[in-house]
């Protein structure tokens, strides 16, 4: 509040009432993606206060209230909102395919955040996986075509190691798998899709359907712990906007890392929907928790299905090891 008062005096602005101060603090906390910390970027705060002052004077008010700050913040967003609207329109017109209901095997709704200067917005992305008999390699299609960055490639390697360590400690993993961000035509960077990618892989291997009414974001370590990511508020709101536009079912929502529970600074509209049970924000601290939320199956059932499929692929691998190229029993020429 001291910085707010300093900027107010420096710019000769109207005083703020308690509601106005609270709204500015909320805005600053959202910019930091942390409800326990505030952004001290003077330029942004100065712009917000100046716009709020203009709105208050236009309304004939003697103080800047919460409604003036809210209007200023929304106006700043609206000026760049055409990019978000165009992106979301592609999903709503089904040009970009993203399901928000039903189930699908090997398909998960990931969440991405797009940055345009100081403006950012979230959008769901369809991530798919396939699994078949092979030599244990997880193919990162984004990397193969030079669309995947180094951090994303590292994340896929961590997923591969986690998968092998979990289901094939004492023998080679007898499968080949592939991962891809569908309908993505630009570079992919970051590790925030790690949870979504591993869930898609396990779903494809075990033939277990994933709830498409949920989206997920989160990084992973080799022990299966879900780690923090960036842009959590924008990602939640991006999926919420799509669900709302299509008509909320009451079962839609997002899964985020547990570490972000204190970082949420969501729009009031989203908070109201959560309070009314129309939208849900779940947290997961481990891949086990994420799997159970996204599939509705117990982790014991999921692991049993994966191990059964791995055992089946091992039997197939052994049967092929004695076959020639044409599938006939190999023999010496003697």
How should these model regions be labeled?
Residues 1-9, 23, 292-295:
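Conserved AAA+ ATPase core "coupling" helix
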Residues 6-13, 26-34, 54, 58, ...:
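Conserved helix-loop functional segments at active or binding sites
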Residues 10-16, 29-100, 317-324:
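C-terminal helical "lid" subdomain and adjoining coupling/linker elements of P-loop NTPases
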Residues 14-21, 35-46, 62-66, 145-149, ...:
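Conserved phosphate/pyrophosphate-binding and hydrolysis machinery centered on Walker-type P-loop NTPases
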Residues 22, 43-46, 50, 67, ...:
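Non-catalytic, well-ordered alpha-helical scaffold segments
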Residues 71-72, 78-149, 160:
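Core mixed alpha/beta domains of very large multi-subunit molecular machines
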Residues 93-96, 125, 131-147, 151-334:
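Peripheral, non-AAA+ core regions of ATP-driven protein-machinery
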